[in-house]
Swiss-Prot record:
Protein name: Spermidine/putrescine import ATP-binding protein PotA
Key words of the record: ATP-binding, Cell inner membrane, Cell membrane, Membrane, Nucleotide-binding, Translocase, Transport
Residues of the ABC transporter domain: 7-241
SMART domains assigned: AAA
Length: 361
């Protein structure tokens, strides 16, 4: 990355017990996060993402390793001395205070000149587009409005980094999508680093400049949303980010020294990317939307039968049982030219080479 580094996490581990039989909450985690970056920690419950966020904030002491903020080691510093603020899932607004008073509270605790506080509050109200609601109490606000107030309050003291612990999870789907757009806008306008924790894959792909996918206390892969979705380096990452199918089989060399995948139990040869070793057992992975359903009499394709049809509005999902008894999920966009397909219908599946990923068996 060409930008200056905002946060450095170096070989950080966190253990809650000295019992060697218990896995650590964080296991030798390292990552650099740039200034002004929207960086997401993504993973299932219990993967360590919130523990890492809390360690950066200073709410958790690390067992090993180092956390640096703008080049300074902060392991020994309490949270209030780290120039890092946190937005929690619960928002934690003061119910007896107005919107403006909630935003001003952190500035008052910081000892800011009282003459400058109203101007800073006005800036934050404008940033989150809530000038007209400055006098309301939290109970008079919607969930999305409360989230904006919590965001404004956290940004008001001008932290170096803002940490967000699943702040959208309590909102309904429509409001959550609206707030995703708002959150990205606020981050770009505020011009500071956001570190965002979520288990929602779509949320991570939508918001992030880069994503770290975590499992069992480890970071498995760091990359842009396109890298993570299109080029997963681990089976867990491939399965956790979106839907994906796996076919076991063998690699061999074609006539022109290209890679050819032969699925187990099927006399089909599928051109695939230049990965792997000739003769090695591998898994061919492909996304449902990257495959193409074609007529069953087409040669050189996977063959199978449709077992289930799921209409999802803009697309239809087809669960197919291939002739080697492997089940795969396929997706077709619902366009005017598409004809409906029925359960029991024989089909063939075309996999373009660019749709194929090779992974270890």
């Amino acid at each position: 990355m060409g930008q200056p580094i905002a946060i450095e996490v170096r070989n950080v581990s966190k253990r809650y017990s000295d019992d060697p039989g218990l896995a650590p909450a964080l296991d030798n985690v390292s990552v650099n996060i740039a200034d002004n970056e929207f960086f997401t920690l993504l993973g299932p419950s219990g993967c360590g993402k919130t523990t890492l966020l809390r360690a950066i904030a200073g709410f958790e002491h690390v067992s090993d390793g180092e956390i640096r903020l703008a080049g300074e080691t902060v392991n020994h510093l309490p949270p209030f001395k780290r120039r890092v603020n946190t937005v929690f899932q619960s928002y934690a607004l003061f119910p007896h205070m107005s919107v403006a008073q909630n935003i001003a509270f952190g500035l008052e605790m910081q000892g800011l000149d009282r003459k400058t506080i109203p101007g800073r509050v006005d800036e934050m109200l404008a940033l989150v587009q809530m000038e007209h609601l400055a006098g309301r109490k939290p109970a008079q606000l919607s969930g999305g409005q409360q989230q904006r107030v919590a965001l404004a309050r956290a940004l008001a003291p001008k932290p170096k980094v803002l940490l967000l612990d699943e702040p959208l999870s309590a909102l309904d789907l429509k409001l959550r999508k609206e707030m995703q757009v708002e959150l990205k806008r606020v981050q770009q306008e505020a011009g500071i680093t956001f570190i965002f924790v979520t288990h929602d894959q779509e949320e991570a792909l939508t918001l992030s400049d880069r994503i770290a996918v975590m499992s069992a206390g480890k970071i498995l892969q760091i990359g842009t949303p396109i890298d993570i979705y299109e080029r997963p380096q681990h089976r867990f990452v491939a399965q956790f980010i979106g839907d994906i199918n796996f076919l076991p089989g063998q690699l061999k060399r074609g006539e022109h020294n290209e890679n050819i995948f032969v699925p187990n139990g099927m006399p089909v040869e599928i051109p695939c990317p230049p990965q792997g070793v000739n003769g090695s057992s591998v898994q061919l992975a492909f996304r449902p939307e990257r495959s193409q359903l074609v007529a069953a009499d087409q040669p050189h394709h996977l063959r199978g039968v449709i077992e289930a049809v799921l209409y999802v509005g803009t697309a239809t999902l087809y669960q197919c049982r291939l002739n080697n008894d492997i089940k795969v999920m396929l997706r077709e966009n619902n366009e005017g030219l598409n004809r409906g397909r029925a359960v029991g219908e024989p089909v063939a599946v075309h996999l373009p080479p660019q749709a194929c990923l090779l992974m270890e068996a």
